[in-house]
């Protein structure tokens, strides 16, 4: 049934007796529309007008106490008979806190308020949610209890605390580093494969002044000193960048030279492993940053086998061999 529309009218008279008589003799005409015959072409066949006695209307109202009526204007009402679907979307609020009440709570309260007041309700169910840490701990304890033999006895000490979770063993050394790549200050020497190098060396060396300029510098560069030494039968090359006046730059090494090696090539904007263009101090000819170690003016044969190198100096790892 789609709906019941009351079409009967109320005629108000001046006399009280006539009004009571008319109310007793009043009949209600109801317009009924059938939804089962919607496919019929004739519209009059799906619409009927019924007459409902007052006694049946009174019994209908008493049998449906939850039925609602909307007053459009005096004398005409719309009775909403299908409340089953509309009641599903209605939410009940808690009488204490105003939050949404539990659906099955007979006291119309939320779980917290209903439980705090001590009401006997079926919604007082303990939550089955377990934190992740406790679940992981239970799984580990179950795994240790199921593991047999020496595995169970060895892991029993770790799980004896209950709350302590065994962790992985962490390597104290950083990834990508090794003890052989760092030179400790207290070590007397460094051994790499078959070669053995001293921890500190001191000797005379020839430093050549060169002008360093990058590709994006636009011709502006800075002066640096380049040298090549022989230590332990191996050839080492390096460039010493200008670090500024001695008063503004505190040297970290024990040498008294005004020019120190840069740890990352920050002084000239270039890196020793990616050398920029080198220009000689006197001439304007640009050349690559490679010097022949066998030249008499640059490398002396009577040079001692050791030379002083302050800590932090970087060299070419693979120098060209003649």
UniProtKB/Swiss-Prot annotation:
Disulfide bonds: none annotated. Disruption phenotype: No visible phenotype. The double mutant sty1-1 and sty2-1 has a reduction in the amount of stylar and stigmatic tissues and decreased proliferation of stylar xylem, as well as shorter siliques and rosette and cauline leaves with a higher degree of serration. Hypersensitive to 1-N-naphthylphtalamic acid (NPA), but restored by exogenous application of auxin. GO terms for biological process: anther development; auxin biosynthetic process; auxin-activated signaling pathway; pollen development. The keyword Metal-binding applies. InterPro entries: SHI, SHI_C, Znf_LRP1. Residues 147-163 have a biased composition (Gly residues). Residues 94-121 bind DNA. Expressed in seedlings, roots, cauline leaves, flowers and siliques. It is found in: Nucleus. Zn(2+) 2 binds at residues 94, 110, 114, 121. Residues 247-263 have a biased composition (Low complexity). Zn(2+) 1 binds at residues 94, 97, 105, 110. A motif (Required for homo- and heterodimerization) lies at residues 231-234. GO terms for molecular function: DNA binding; DNA-binding transcription factor activity; metal ion binding. One of its GO terms (cellular component) is nucleus. Belongs to the SHI protein family. Transcription activator that binds DNA on 5'-ACTCTAC-3' and promotes auxin homeostasis-regulating gene expression (e.g. YUC genes), as well as genes affecting stamen development, cell expansion and timing of flowering. Synergistically with other SHI-related proteins, regulates gynoecium, stamen and leaf development in a dose-dependent manner, controlling apical-basal patterning. Promotes style and stigma formation, and influence vascular development during gynoecium development. May also have a role in the formation and/or maintenance of the shoot apical meristem (SAM). This is Protein SHI RELATED SEQUENCE 2. It comes from Arabidopsis thaliana (Mouse-ear cress). The lineage of its organism: Eukaryota, Viridiplantae, Streptophyta, Embryophyta, Tracheophyta.
